[in-house]
């Protein structure tokens, strides 16, 4: 299935049902008076966040959505049936914009969360409502209002705890395949990954986190070079970024220091807020070096980058060091959640009067 993370759709709410002109007609009652009922309200259109979707590909072939119209009123003061609301399921992490103005309408980040994108038309009014002391037989009614119609843009930002960052062939897809049930395409050439992959990483029997792998970045990615720029937005919601470096023996075209600097520059150029997301350094393909050189290699890279954060040496292909990495990630995510809960529960300071 093709991965789609941005789409434009048209939504139209239902029209309100018309009110009607009607008079009571019964045997032996010559002047029964008005009994025209109101129409029903038009159905509204809502977007609803679903955890069963991870792409907007369902919207490739269906771009127009319309809620049901309200029914007209009836005699005997019967109100018309309201149109049924339309709920459109979208993936978690979908942002909704007015296509014409780029105004943000909402951000769907919780399962079951809904967003009204087109309100149904108001019901029409029957002639009973116009009866008064001076107008006992009104022959006027009001039509139902039109429902809202608008063109909206849906933009998906995947919700993942951990995002994988790095140059093409740094081993990101190999890592996510090693630690989760995700099955990305893996091959020994650049840009094997053509779209983001999500995997659930289980740590122990009860704990897990979600990992996201996007296509590798190259110099100029923020300006549209390569493939990764199309999917950089999916890293914006991650709580931890793992920056993978290929540490296999250097060639003329491969240098982990240069690779790190290029990817870091493109990341910040795309969005400076990425600097606020914790980033861990992951030195991959260390099994291509003799074991006695691992520590030396790690120290050389850390010193060259003046790296102050966390660093791990692994081999994603061989599964060396990956369990320790995932355990550390789970511990960090648990601590983050605990800190956030404590901040939310902290009482506000009393106001001084």
From Swiss-Prot:
Compartments (UniProt record): Cytoplasm
Domain OBG-type G: 160-334
A GO CC term assigned to this protein in UniProt: cytoplasm
EC number: 3.6.5.-
Record keywords: Cytoplasm, GTP-binding, Hydrolase, Magnesium, Metal-binding, Nucleotide-binding
GO MF annotation list: GTP binding; GTPase activity; magnesium ion binding
The protein's enzyme class: hydrolase
Principal localisation: cytoplasm
Essential cofactor(s): Mg(2+)
Sequence ranges assigned to domain Obg in this UniProt record: 1-159
Residues holding GTP: 166-173, 191-195, 213-216, 284-287, 315-317
Name of the molecule in the record: GTPase Obg
Species of provenance: Dichelobacter nodosus (strain VCS1703A)
